[in-house]
Every structure is written in structure tokens, then in C-alpha cells.
Design a protein with these regions (language model features):
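Alpha-helical substrate-recognition element adjacent to the catalytic core
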Residues: 1-36, 96-98, 106-113, 135-365
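A short, acidic, amphipathic alpha-helical segment used as a generic capping/interface helix at domain edges
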Residues: 41-59, 315-317
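Glycine-rich anion-binding loop/nest that anchors nucleotide
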Residues: 49-53, 64-76, 331-333
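Nucleo/cytoplasmic regulatory scaffolds in medium-to-very-large eukaryotic proteins
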Residues: 62, 84-85, 108-118
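Hydrophobic anchor at the start of a short beta-strand
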Residues: 66, 91-94, 329-330
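Acidic, divalent-metal-coordinating active-site segment for phosphoryl/phosphodiester hydrolysis
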Residues: 68-86, 316, 338-344
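Glycine-rich phosphate-binding active-site loops on the catalytic face of alpha/beta enzymes
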Residues: 89-103
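Short, basic/aromatic recognition patches
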Residues: 112-138
Length: 366
């Protein structure tokens, strides 16, 4: 797919593709915020990008079909359906996740789209045969959308735990750097994992930037975890906005460096930035890159699966075949750009965007 890739900010890596501002102007839209993956606005922007990308490498060729590769029925399935609707295209999606129970597939048809759900990544062979049976042609009129996180890289149920571990590593490193000698790793990890539960998603908005910031404030001693949990459960604190506003009223009690970090995060939050904790996300990028391609080809597969973010063999092989048949490959990621693309300084040291980093290709193991 080269650089036909967009991360959360919908800023194409390939400079030939239009920017989000250019797309909004062409569509006569004024969006207050960058749309998320499951929104109809996201789908309309992506449909515009896909048509432009197809024109770049195959002038005069029209997109007629979408083949989507993902790992979550709700998020990826919704995004897929919206994209097909926005482009007025038919489509079929493979939604995979490795599980220990016996092989099972499920087919859900709705309007001009089909979801093919499987509990094995190697069920892609069954999916490809299903496409043949349904006369779903994969050719120059087809766009193959490759979800990057936990599909193309770090296959869900097989290797995705490394992506999660890397995020925790980055959060730990960030908070440790800021708290210095006051940092208590056990206390931090207890707070992080406790508040990362579904019960607290209405409070944290299931946003990792918010969660890591909350853990930073807890680590500073400004607020203790037990009090916060009680406040959330009793609805005295119902949102992250309420929490950070309360912290802002107590900044005089924070050390100067933490006060500066708080002010930066609070300012970005008020401006509507969904990833306001930049230091954390930059560390997440560096930690991710450090877990790609560093062990070597002679490393036992199980060790690779436990320590590296790997390319999913089945997805890789299928994508190569589809590209050879003329399909357009386009990568999607809902991961923040700051956690996926190096800063200028990082790039000057040889760092590359996540999708360009070489790492091992691993499939199912017996």
C-alpha cells in the first residue's frame, strides 16, 4: 500500500493525496472536529481519498467494490458499512480474531454489504473462496481497506497483547519521567489498570491520553485513587472535563514541571484536541518502533509473538495477491498520528512511520 495510509487525523502520508482541509473545501463542509472512524463524516472523507488514490495510480479507473480487513465487528463493521454507503459501492468485509474454540465463521448480509466473521486469521482462505462463490471480483475496480492496528499488525487474539503492553510501557515511562523520584510503579500500574476497566469508560471516555493524565495527577499526590473512585461511583465526578477543571483550580499545589505539563494538556483539551498528552503519545511511538524487527529472523516464533509487533502472515499474503490482481490497497488506523509518525527530530534520527517499519511476518502456530 506504500504511503496510501491515514491515521486518526485523516492526514494522508502520501503527499499526492488531498489534505483534510482541501477535502472539506471540495465537499463544502466545515467540521468542528476530526471525525472518528465510525462516523458518516469519516466515511465521506475516506471515499473522497480513495477515489483520488485510485486516480493517482490508475487514471480513469472507477472504484466499484470495497473489501475491508478488520478485527472488530462493531467499530470496523460500522466504518465499513458507512464507507460503502458514502461511495455507493458494494462491499465485503473479513473481521478476524484468533480464539481457542473450534473454527467458526458467520456471514451477515445487509443491503449491498456482507460481513464475514471468523475466529481464525487463517480462515482468510475460506473467505477468499467465499468471495469466488459470490462472484465478488477483486480487480482494478476494487479497493482493499486494511485496518492496521490488530489486523495487519499485531493480529487480534494472536499478537495484539504486545500493542497493549507497549502502550502501558509508554504510559509508565512518561509518568516516571515527570514524577522522578516520587514515581511509584506499583501504585501507578494499579491505578492505570483499575481505571482502564469498562466501568470507568464514561469518566475516562475510554481515552488513553485522559487515563494517563489522571494517573499522573494521582501519582503526584494531589488526589488519591480511593477518593477518585468514590467520587466517580457516587457521580460527584462524572467526566474527564470535570476532573481536569478541578485539577486546574489546584495547580498551585503541583510542582512547577507538572504545572507546566497540566497547563499544556488542559489548553489542548479545551481546544478539542482528542490526544492532548503529546509526551505520552511520542513515547508510545518510540516504544512501538522499539518492538518491531529488533529480535531477528532466528528468534523462536513464540518469543516473537510475545515481544514484537508483527505483520499478520495471512493478511500480508492476501493483500499481495489482491494487489497483483489490480486492487488498490489503502491502510487505515484510528491510532493517533503522534503515536504512529515520528516528529521531525525523530525522523532526522532515522525513525519511520509505523507502517514503514520492517518487522517479522508470522502466521498461525500449532
Amino acid at each position: 500500500m506504500g504511503d496510501f495510509v491515514v491515521y486518526r487525523n485523516l492526514a494522508p502520508i502520501d503527499p499526492r493525496l488531498p489534505t483534510l482541509d482541501e477535502i472539506n473545501k471540495a465537499q463544502d463542509k466545515q467540521l468542528d472536529a476530526i471525525p472518528r472512524k465510525t462516523s458518516p463524516d469519516y466515511a465521506e472523507i475516506l471515499a473522497f481519498l480513495l477515489r483520488d488514490a485510485r486516480t493517482q495510480d490508475a487514471p480513469g479507473t472507477q472504484i466499484e467494490r470495497v473489501l475491508f480487513m478488520g478485527d472488530t465487528r462493531m467499530n470496523d463493521g460500522t466504518a465499513f458499512a458507512n464507507i460503502c454507503s458514502a461511495g455507493n459501492w458494494s462491499g465485503i468485509a473479513f473481521i478476524g480474531s484468533e480464539r481457542e474454540d473450534p473454527l467458526h465463521t458467520e456471514i451477515i448480509e445487509q443491503n449491498n454489504t456482507t460481513l464475514f466473521l471468523a475466529n481464525r486469521w487463517n480462515a482468510l482462505d475460506v473467505f477468499i473462496e467465499y468471495c469466488h462463490q459470490k462472484d465478488f471480483h477483486i480487480d482494478e475496480h476494487t479497493v482493499v481497506l486494511l485496518d492496521i492496528d490488530k489486523t495487519t499488525l499485531g493480529a487480534r487474539g494472536r499478537n495484539d497483547h504486545v500493542i497493549d503492553q507497549v502502550r502501558v510501557e509508554a504510559a509508565t515511562q512518561t509518568v516516571s519521567n515527570l514524577l522522578g523520584g516520587e514515581f511509584d510503579i506499583e501504585r501507578f500500574q494499579h491505578a492505570y489498570h483499575y481505571l482502564n476497566q469498562t466501568e470507568f469508560h464514561p469518566f475516562t471516555a475510554d481515552n488513553q491520553d485522559y487515563l494517563v493524565y489522571i494517573c499522573l495527577i494521582l501519582g503526584s499526590g494531589l488526589i488519591d485513587l480511593e477518593t477518585l473512585i468514590d467520587d466517580v461511583r457516587s457521580a460527584r465526578v462524572v467526566s474527564f472535563s470535570q476532573f481536569i477543571t478541578q485539577v486546574d483550580k489546584k495547580t498551585s499545589q503541583l510542582p512547577p514541571e507538572l504545572r507546566s505539563i497540566h497547563e499544556d494538556i488542559y489548553s489542548r483539551f479545551k481546544q478539542g484536541d482528542p490526544t492532548p498528552f503529546k509526551a505520552f503519545r511520542y513515547n508510545e511511538y518510540l516504544a512501538s518502533a522499539a518492538h518491531m524487527g529488533h529480535l531477528g529472523v532466528d528468534t523462536p516464533v513464540r518469543e516473537l509473538l510475545s515481544q514484537e509487533i508483527l505483520i499478520t502472515h495471512e493478511v500480508h499474503q492476501a493483500a499481495l495477491a489482491w494487489r497483483a490482481q489490480g486492487a488498490l490497497l489503502f491502510g487505515l488506523s484510528d491510532k493517533p498520528d503522534e503515536a504512529s509518525i515520528p516528529t521531525g527530530e525523530m525522523a532526522s534520527r532515522g525513525n519511520k512511520p509505523i507502517h514503514q517499519i520492517e518487522t517479522e511476518i508470522v502466521g498461525a502456530i500449532s
